[in-house]
Amino acid sequence: MSNNLFTVPEDWQKRAWCDDARYQKMYDESVNDPDAFWSREAQRIDWFEPFSKVKNSSFNGDVDIKWFLDGKLNVAYNCLDRHLEKRGDQTAIIFEGNEPGVEEKITYRQLYERVCRFSNVLKSCGVKKGDRVSIYLPMIPQLAVAMLACARIGAIHSIVFAGFSPDALANRITDAECTILITADEGLRGPKAIGLKEAADEAMDKAGMVKKCIVVKHTGADVPMKAGRDLWWHELTAKESTECPPESMDSEDPLFILYTSGSTGTPKGVLHTTGGYIVYTSLTHQYVFDYHDGDIYWCTADIGWVTGHSYIIYGPLANGAVTIMFEGIPNYPDFSRFWQICDKHQVNIFYTAPTVVRALMQQGDEPVKATSRTSVRLLGTVGEPINPEAWLWYHRVVGEERCPIVDTWWQTETGGIMITPLPGATALKPGSATRPFFGIQPALIDKEGNQLEGPGEGYLVMLDSWPALARTVYGDHRRFKSTYFIQCPGTYFSGDGARRDEDGYYWITGRIDDVINVSGHRLGTAEIESSLVAHPAVSEAAVVGFPHDIKGQAIYAYVTLSSGYEPSEELRKELSLFVRKDIGPIATPEVLQFTDSLPKTRSGKIMRRILRKVACNELDNLGDTSTLADPAVVEALIKNRIDACR
C-alpha cells in the first residue's frame, strides 16, 4: 500500500463538476433515496415515453433486475439524433488510423447519416428487433456505425474482438444464434495485416448459421466472396437512404451481448439492456472524466471489450462528446505514438490500461518527453489494479505532476465504472481505486460470510443493484445466478478481493482465485507483484500459487526484466530478499522464473490460468489459448519452467 496522498488541486476543486462536499451530498442521496436520485439523473437522456418506476430489483430468489420500468427510448437516438440541432457540425469521432497521417473527423450529422444508411442495410437483410448481429471488425469507423445501427433498429449486437480466433468467433456466433456477420477484408495492427475475412470464413464454416456476411473493404486485400452470402459494405450502403426512424425500445429490451471469460473456460454472453445502461454510462463518463463541452477525450481500449462499448461509444456520444478511435498499437511506428496523438489532436482526457503504462514505462522517459502533452489535463486507468510504481511514473512523467489519475474499477458485468476517484473531489492514493461512484454500495465479506465494518480485507460485493448491471447470461440465467449471486446471498459477488483502509478507500487485491494461501496466510497476488515491480530490475511480474506439501500453497513468480538487466542466480536471490523485506517472510517467492514475456490476451490481461498450469506442471491441459496475443510465449515458459511442485 502506498503511503503517498495527492490532494485535490484548488483549481480542480473549482472547475470540476463535483468537489468533495458535492460528492458526499450526491452519494448520500444516491444510496438513501435512490428513486429521487436516479429519477433526476435519468433526465439526462431523452425518453419517448416516461418510466413509471425507477427500479424493481432483487438479488435473491430468481434474481430479477429492472430499471426505469415501462420507459421507452432508443440509444442511437440519444447518441445521435438529439444532438443534430446544436452539434450537427461538431466532430463526434476522430478516427486515427494505424499509419500516422491516416485520420478522419466524422461530425454528428455525418455519423447519423452513416448509421441510418447501415440501419437500412440491416433491414434489407431481414434483420428485425431482437435479432442478434455478430460484429468482427477492427477499430475503424464502420465498427461504431454498425453497433449504433443495431441499436437504432432494435437488433442486439455481439461484438467479437478482431484478434480472436475463428474458433472463438464461431463459438460466439453459435451461442448468440447470429445469422448476420459483419467483418472486414483485413485489420491492421502495427506492421501486420490480420486476415479477418479469412478467419470469418472459417468461423462461418464451423458455425453454419450465418446467412449474410457484410464485408468492409478496408485494406483492399483480395478476399474470397461467397455468392449469395457475402456482400460488400460500400455497395450496400450506397443504395440506402440517410433516414431511418429509430425503433422505440423498452428500457429493459436488450442492447448488446458481450462475451467474457468464465472460470470454466467457457465464454459467458453477458447481456446488457437499454435504459439503465445508457443513463449510467452517460453519468459516469461526465463525472469520472470531468467531461465538459469541447474536451477531446481518448480511451485507448478496443471496442471489442466493454471499456470500448461504454467509454468510446455509448457514454461519450450520449454526452455529445468528441471521442477518439485509434486503430493502431502503442509502439508503432515507435513508443511515442500515444503521446504524438495526444499532441496532434490536443487530447484533454486520456484513459488506458495499466499494462500499457507498464510497457511504456519499460522504455524509459524519452519517448514521452519527446512530446509536449500540454493539452492533457486528466489521466485514467482501467482493466486491472495499477501498481503504485507505475501510477507514480504515469503521474510524474506523462502527467508532469499536474494531471489527476482516475484509477477505475469495474467489470464487463457492471456495465460502467463502479469504484473510482472523481478528479475534483478525491484525494488520490497510488494503487487505490478510492471510493464508490454514485449509487454503488460496496461491502467486504469474510470467508465465513460476515460483512466487515471499518478497515479490513475480504470479498468485494455490492449490496444493491445499479442501472447498468447486466441482467443475465444470454440463454443461461441459471449460470448468471450461480456465478454472481449464490456465494454471498443477497449481494452481487464481484469475484474480486479488496482491502478497505481507515479512510474508506478501496484497494483491489485481485481476483479471488488470485489469492494464495501460504501456511494459512492469505496473500493477494497484486501485492506481491507490486513489490517485485518496485525493484528497478523488474519491468513486469506475475505471481501464482502452486501446491506445497508443507505450506499448502507456495509462491511461483514470473519476472520480466527491465532493459539493461540480465537473468542471474544473484538477481533471483536479490529479488526474493527484496519481497521478503518489503512484505514479510511469508510472501517470499518459493520459485522465481525469468521470462522475456508473459502470456497475455489481446486486451493486455495476463492469463494466470496458463501460469498456474505451467507452475504446477499440468502441461497436458492448458485449456483454450485462442485469445493469447502470442502463443509462442507459452512454449518459452514451459521450456524454462523450474520444477516447483512438492
From Swiss-Prot:
Give binding positions for Mg(2+): 533, 535, 538
List UniProt keywords, sorted A-Z: Acetylation, ATP-binding, Ligase, Magnesium, Metal-binding, Nucleotide-binding
Q: How is it modified after translation?
A: Acetylated. Deacetylation by the SIR2-homolog deacetylase activates the enzyme.
- One MF term from GO for this chain? metal ion binding
Q: Which InterPro entries match?
A: Ac_CoA_lig (IPR011904), ACAS_N (IPR032387), AMP-bd_C (IPR025110), AMP-bd_C_sf (IPR045851), AMP-binding_CS (IPR020845), AMP-dep_synth/lig_dom (IPR000873), ANL_N_sf (IPR042099)
Q: Which enzyme class? A: ligase
SUPFAM superfamilies of this UniProt entry? Acetyl-CoA synthetase-like
- So which residues are the signal peptide here? none
Question: Which EC number(s) does UniProt give?
Answer: 6.2.1.1
| Gene Ontology annotations for the cellular component aspect, listed alphabetically | cytosol
Which cofactor names does the annotation list? Answer: Mg(2+)
> Any idea which residues bear N6-acetyllysine here?
605
Catalytic activity field: acetate + ATP + CoA = acetyl-CoA + AMP + diphosphate
Is ATP-binding among this UniProt entry's keywords?
yes
Q: Which residues form a coiled coil?
A: none
- BP GO annotations: acetyl-CoA biosynthetic process from acetate
Chain sites annotated for binding ATP: 383-385, 407-412, 496, 511, 522
Quote the record's binding site residues for CoA.
189-192, 307, 331, 519, 580
HAMAP family named in the record: Ac_CoA_synth
Q: Family assignment?
A: Belongs to the ATP-dependent AMP-binding enzyme family.
Per its database record, what is this protein's job? Answer: Catalyzes the conversion of acetate into acetyl-CoA (AcCoA), an essential intermediate at the junction of anabolic and catabolic pathways. AcsA undergoes a two-step reaction. In the first half reaction, AcsA combines acetate with ATP to form acetyl-adenylate (AcAMP) intermediate. In the second half reaction, it can then transfer the acetyl group from AcAMP to the sulfhydryl group of CoA, forming the product AcCoA.
What is this protein's record name? Acetyl-coenzyme A synthetase
